[in-house]
Amino acid sequence: MADSYDLTAIRNIGIMAHIDAGKTTTTERILFYSGRVHKMGEVDKGTATMDWMSQEQERGITITSAATACKWKGYFVNIIDTPGHVDFTVEVERSLRVLDGSIGIFCAVAGVQPQSETVWRQADRYHVPRIAYINKMDRVGADFFRVIEMIRKNLSSDAVAIQLPIGVEEAFSGIIDLIDFKAYIYEDESGEQYQERELNPDERSKAQEFRNLLLERLAEYDDSILEKYLEAREISPAEIRSSLRKSCISNQIVPVLCGSSFKNKGVQMLLDAVVSYLPSPLDIPAIEAMDIASGENVRIKPEVDAPLCALAFKLASDPYVGKLTYFRIYSGRIKAGSTLFNSRQDRKERFTRLLKMHANHREEIEEACAGDIVAGVGLKNTATGDTLCSENHLVLLETIDFPQPVIDVAIEAKTRADQERIEESLRRLAEEDPTFQTRQDKESGQMIISGMGELHLEIIIDRLLKEFKVNANIGKPQVAYKESVKKRTAAEVKFDRQAGGRGQYAHVVLEVLPLAEGQGKRFADKSSPEAIPREFIPAVEMGVREALQAGILGGYPVDDVEVVLKGGSYHEVDSNEPAFKIAASMALKEALENAQSVFLEPVMDLEIICPEEYLGDVISDLNARRGRIIALEENRDTKAVKGLVPLAETFGYATSLRSLTQGRASFSMKIKNFAEVPESKSREIIARRYGLPV
């Protein structure tokens, strides 16, 4: 058993893949073989330990990342099982931010799929070392070697087999270990027992070929391996493992394994690879933070006796303990009941309880240390991306960035009592999920909820109705348009109200500038303290930001703009914060009137897999939807169409594609960017928005 304070024996890993590649089934087998659970859960029966939400059990998919931990051969493994559906990519993003390594799971039939690419790029961004596991080797059409080629080509990764399958499809019966040069045959259904044997002549020939490929790849990065390889000297399994570990941790090589998690084959060897090749907290570069006192960047080393530094990466509601805050400890230690400092919020927080999570089950602990991932109860003001640290050593970690929502749904309470419950429920859900947002429509007064896709909002609404017991009328999904500007413009407003007694006075001059796509909203103060005292600047910014929530074309949020406060004036007696907030809001509205406002719409990356005989119809339909073809790729029996299409044109696409291809095509899509809406479509949006004839 590993001591949780022995950092060399800790592995913090994530499990990531496209939907239906077998992530949760693999996690269930890991928990069973490690002794963490005593019965295997099954996704299709709704009994998976990690899919504990009712919405996950009903749909057979993972919706929220679930944390657990197990022990394997003296190592302590923290595991986060992440969703594979594009609507829940935020769960992958925030998990990878705090993990040291990951397992990328690929279906042996489908290979690299669209969401496989998305999560792989996310792991690239955070420099997370990973191993690849080609699952479902028992399925008809399984091709281990084809999937390795896809990983190399589509993911630009140096994928190298360290195992070979024995048999394929129904004949898949075991695994060849290229490092130990042994065969392992599974004989019982549970997979708990497997027999080791020597390789037969045919297996030996194939294994030698791939072992040489492995050694050649290692020799590129390891001089000691290169020297022995060139001199034809024997290289021991221990030397290969040591070299492979270094190459994996430095993201030079991705070791590739195989198995069938559902048929209980290959999972124990996958666990061996996790502890052998993925890093401990000591093996990865120390994380950077800003020292608040000096303003300089410092490196936070994973030391138990150092000052505390931790990152809150996930919030969740628990029916028994209330708000749970998940966090990764980078240095120091935390005790239950201790007080710490939230440096982003600039306030103290106190833990009442510390918990080790196993999906939705809680294990109370007294202390947690550097390298660990735990949950805390009692943090009232901490949000996702906040830094928790010692009060005598204030540091700030880089926060976590999340994509903007792309789809809206109107929601309306059935009674006044439900209205209050809706507002509180939505606040809690938005606290948990940074890609879920709420706002009130200025025109209709309706509450608008926004998310990453139809399934995302469907799950949110289901939770509102079932978990929070809210009675509400739900509208149809709508595109979450944004507004922006194309022209630089300025406006000047004097707000002067005198109505007996003390008046209100504020004078502001604002300039509005367009920004490139994805730059968000910026506010800059270039006024002089003599024109506007510094204490009124936050009120000006607040007025600007509130006014940006509703543009002048259709009342949609304004984005990709910079608003600059150029100047103004004040009155020593009559000026106050509310006056400057009102003046700033009025000036911004006036500036937007002259800034050539436009609509921005979400554009989706679309990939369609279809038989060749339907290709013409699929492309014609895509063109009619304002789509643009980017690439056509050959698969074994199908064509892959990759393109861009506005989200507004994709509602009901699943039904249309089924009709066009007699149900023989599939598609997936994810947000690419926001782009300007053509003028003809803009007129349609305005007409629909205000109930005018289109």
UniProtKB/Swiss-Prot annotation:
Q: Which GO terms describe its molecular function?
A: GTP binding; GTPase activity; translation elongation factor activity
SMART domains in the cross-refs: EFG_C, EFG_IV
Question: Sorted alphabetically, which keywords does the UniProt record give?
Answer: Cytoplasm, Elongation factor, GTP-binding, Nucleotide-binding, Protein biosynthesis
- InterPro entries cross-referenced by the UniProt entry: EFG_II, EFG_III, EFG_III/V, EFG_IV, EFG_V, EFG_V-like, EFTu-like_2, G_TR_CS
Q: Which GO terms describe its cellular component?
A: cytoplasm
Q: Where in the cell is it found?
A: Cytoplasm
Residues covered by the tr-type G domain? 8-282
The residues listed in the UniProt record as binding GTP, with positions renumbered to this chain, are 17-24, 81-85, 135-138
One of the protein's GO biological processes? ribosome disassembly
User: PANTHER family this protein is in?
Assistant: RIBOSOME-RELEASING FACTOR 2, MITOCHONDRIAL, TRANSLATION ELONGATION FACTOR G-RELATED
What is this protein for, i.e. what is its function?
A: Catalyzes the GTP-dependent ribosomal translocation step during translation elongation. During this step, the ribosome changes from the pre-translocational (PRE) to the post-translocational (POST) state as the newly formed A-site-bound peptidyl-tRNA and P-site-bound deacylated tRNA move to the P and E sites, respectively. Catalyzes the coordinated movement of the two tRNA molecules, the mRNA and conformational changes in the ribosome.
Q: Which family does it belong to?
A: Belongs to the TRAFAC class translation factor GTPase superfamily. Classic translation factor GTPase family. EF-G/EF-2 subfamily.
Q: What is this protein called?
A: Elongation factor G 2
Q: What is the lineage of its organism?
A: Bacteria, Bacillati, Bacillota, Clostridia, Eubacteriales
